């Protein structure tokens, strides 16, 4: 038995989960928030307890030190060396990383070079790797990429209709994201349906503050909604998703909001989506509350959000030539029952239908009516478990 920790490092946060492997038992989990800010918050959950402390954490290395010390303080481990492996979520692996990889040689430098493809994510992911390397230099460190699952896409799906030189020289293509989540829920869907994954055609919908939809055939990603970066695809909490590219030069010419590449990235990544249209919030709970109060902008934002998701599901029904199941996962997909109902009701012609008695808050499993030809499933994602499994597989 070994102890493996799965890490998801954000720019100001560090989410973690400690496993006993190969039993896949969660020993503890937690979240460190507001790294680099005053009054950082560290939360540790274990044995039915939740312990929280507020302190100032300047950087990721200090955050990791506090995490490890908390594990000892709460008698979850006796010493640092009980942890024999650490796995890190990394958003962008480009064409260079086609699978999870042990951190050695120039691996970390390559991860940082790929920050161009995920500027909001890869730098923070790399900071988490460096922090653990500094404090636990001798354990196996593994990077697990959101993009790896999508390397099975055919060229017709991942290439853009731009001059070929931009692909060959600049690697401009669709990479996708959330691959670890899509891979996990596809496998769980096969178990739930009682059929081999190799026999299934699935449309997996990872809908959280960020969101992506993937067409999965025989366990392989054949197309996905996110593109060159996690900005592409469906409308999201603060991201536009797909828009007409000509909007950008137009706004550069006629407004003062788009003067630099940083301006463009800020507006498209942080100020758009549900937040931009509603002028209220990027959180679906806030949007639904505003809709209930009759707020027009929130209602429009919600309708646009559902519309873009329906269109992508329809697109992937065409790509797959039908589907056995549509799977909802992540924060919104798992918890917003009215959202699931509204998405499916608009595409019922394809043979999918939700049973309102099954489609309730907190439900998991099959929420379809008995007569539905395409099953509708709700499956909680577990990206951390996939990461822990990959660490165990790659340990020397």
Swiss-Prot record:
> What PROSITE patterns would the database entry show?
ACETATE_KINASE_1, ACETATE_KINASE_2
Annotated cofactor note: Mg(2+). Can also accept Mn(2+).
Main subcellular localisation? cytoplasm
**A biological process term (GO) from this entry:** acetate metabolic process
In this chain, substrate is annotated as bound at 89
**Which GO cellular component does the record give, naming just one?**
cytoplasm
Q: What class of enzyme is it?
A: transferase
Per its UniProt record, what InterPro entries does this chain match? Ac/propionate_kinase, Aliphatic_acid_kin_short-chain, Aliphatic_acid_kinase_CS, ATPase_NBD
Role this protein plays: Catalyzes the formation of acetyl phosphate from acetate and ATP. Can also catalyze the reverse reaction.
Q: What is this protein called?
A: Acetate kinase
Originating organism: Streptococcus pneumoniae serotype 19F (strain G54)
Gene transcribed to yield this protein: ackA
């Amino acid at each position: 038995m070994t102890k493996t920790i799965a890490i998801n490092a954000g720019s100001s946060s560090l989410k973690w989960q400690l496993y006993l492997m190969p039993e896949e038992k969660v020993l503890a989990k937690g979240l460190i928030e507001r790294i680099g800010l005053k009054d950082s918050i560290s939360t540790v959950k274990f044995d039915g307890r939740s312990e929280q402390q507020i302190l100032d954490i300047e950087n990721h290395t200090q955050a990791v030190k506090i995490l490890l010390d908390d594990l000892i303080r709460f008698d979850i481990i006796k010493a640092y060396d009980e942890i024999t492996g650490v796995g890190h979520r990394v958003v962008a692996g480009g064409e260079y990383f086609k699978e999870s990889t042990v951190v050695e040689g120039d691996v970390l430098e390559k991860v940082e070079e790929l920050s161009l493809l995920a500027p909001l994510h890869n730098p923070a992911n790399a900071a988490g790797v460096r922090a653990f390397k500094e404090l636990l230099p001798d354990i196996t460190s593994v990077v697990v990429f959101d993009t790896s699952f999508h390397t099975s896409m055919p060229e017709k799906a991942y290439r853009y209709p731009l001059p070929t030189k931009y692909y060959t020289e600049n690697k401009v293509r669709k990479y996708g994201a959330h691959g670890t989540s899509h891979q996990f829920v596809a496998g769980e869907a096969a178990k739930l349906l009682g059929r081999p994954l190799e026999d299934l055609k699935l449309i997996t919908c990872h809908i959280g503050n960020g969101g992506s939809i993937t067409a999965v055939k025989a366990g392989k990603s054949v197309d996905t909604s996110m593109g060159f970066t996690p900005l592409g695809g469906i409308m999201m909490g603060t991201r536009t998703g797909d828009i007409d590219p000509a909007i950008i030069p137009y706004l550069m010419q006629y407004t003062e909001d788009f003067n630099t590449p940083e301006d463009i990235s800020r507006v498209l990544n942080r100020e758009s989506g549900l937040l931009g249209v509603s002028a209220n919030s990027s959180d679906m709970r806030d949007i639904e509350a505003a809709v209930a109060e009759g707020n027009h902008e929130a209602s429009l934002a919600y309708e646009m959000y559902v519309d873009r998701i329906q269109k992508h599901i329809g697109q992937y029904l065409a790509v797959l030539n039908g589907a056995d199941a549509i799977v909802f996962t992540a924060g919104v997909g798992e918890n917003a029952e009215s959202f699931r109902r509204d998405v499916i009701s608009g595409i019922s012609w394809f043979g999918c239908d939700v049973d309102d008695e099954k489609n309730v808050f907190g439900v998991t499993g099959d929420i379809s009516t008995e007569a539905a030809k395409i099953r509708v499933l709700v499956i909680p994602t577990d990206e951390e478990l996939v990461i822990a499994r990959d660490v165990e597989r790659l340990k020397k």
